[in-house]
């Protein structure tokens, strides 16, 4: 070969030295995997979860032992469920607007690799904000504890859930899944993060809807519990 086609030796060496990457790592759904995207999914989950402070702020005006406004509202004939829902809905839309702005910023300004359709992403954040506000309203309705104690509870719960969802360590959610999988089914932040994975990486609609259903059920339970706690509150004097 060297005697008959000496030019072929040079071409062969050039091909051997060509180090172009011919294999690309993709998910089963055919979408490129970025290991850092887990942090941003967990960040969105934290933004949804922090709606708990908006919900908490809406529950405080219904605690007659904490404010004079709440004392006046407590004695009105308005049905307690109507009061709870009106406060919670207004708090929810405020938190939801904040998260929508965050998603638009991450996707169109920072141009992060969110390959899924926007509609499923907005549905995730809808239920994510709902669970956040519901949690805050629930904690705000707990007994006659001081406001500072309730804020401490919200901080502890929200930061623990966000940590376990992978906000500080992108392998944490997988560690929990291997050792205590039920915890990932009960952690709202992990459910939100996993739902984003389902539409952007895994392409797993069944798992996506399972996460949404769990979030919806938890929101309903927390709202119902808040209503019953506010309804049964009694005061010796206002």
Where are these regions (language model features)?
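Secretory targeting signals
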Residues: 91-95, 99-127, 141
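Hydrophobic alpha-helical transmembrane segments of multi-pass membrane transport/permease proteins
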Residues: 4, 18, 39-56, 96-99, ...
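Transport-system extracytoplasmic interface segments
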Residues: 1-55, 200, 229
């Amino acid at each position: 070969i060297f005697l008959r086609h000496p030019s072929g030796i040079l071409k062969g060496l050039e091909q051997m030295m060509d180090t172009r990457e011919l294999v690309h790592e993709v998910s089963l759904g055919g979408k490129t995997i970025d290991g850092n995207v887990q942090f941003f999914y967990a960040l969105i989950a934290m933004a949804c979860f922090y709606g708990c402070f908006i919900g908490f702020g809406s529950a405080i005006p219904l605690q007659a032992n904490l404010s004079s406004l709440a004392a006046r509202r407590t004695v009105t004939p308005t049905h307690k469920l109507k009061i709870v829902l009106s406060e919670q809905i207004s708090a929810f839309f405020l938190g939801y607007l904040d998260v929508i702005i965050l998603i638009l910023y991450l996707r169109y300004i920072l141009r992060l690799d969110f390959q899924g359709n926007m509609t499923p992403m907005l549905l995730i954040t809808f239920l994510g904000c709902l669970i956040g506000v519901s949690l805050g309203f629930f904690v705000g309705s707990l007994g006659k504890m001081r406001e500072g104690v309730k804020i401490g509870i919200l901080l502890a719960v929200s930061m623990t859930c966000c940590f376990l969802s992978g906000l500080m360590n992108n392998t944490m959610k997988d560690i929990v899944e291997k050792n205590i999988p039920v915890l990932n089914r009960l952690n709202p932040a992990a459910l939100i993060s996993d739902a984003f994975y389902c539409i952007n990486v895994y392409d797993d609609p069944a798992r996506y809807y399972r996460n949404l259903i769990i979030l919806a059920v938890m929101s309903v339970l927390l709202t119902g519990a808040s209503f019953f706690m506010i309804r049964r509150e009694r005061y010796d004097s206002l």
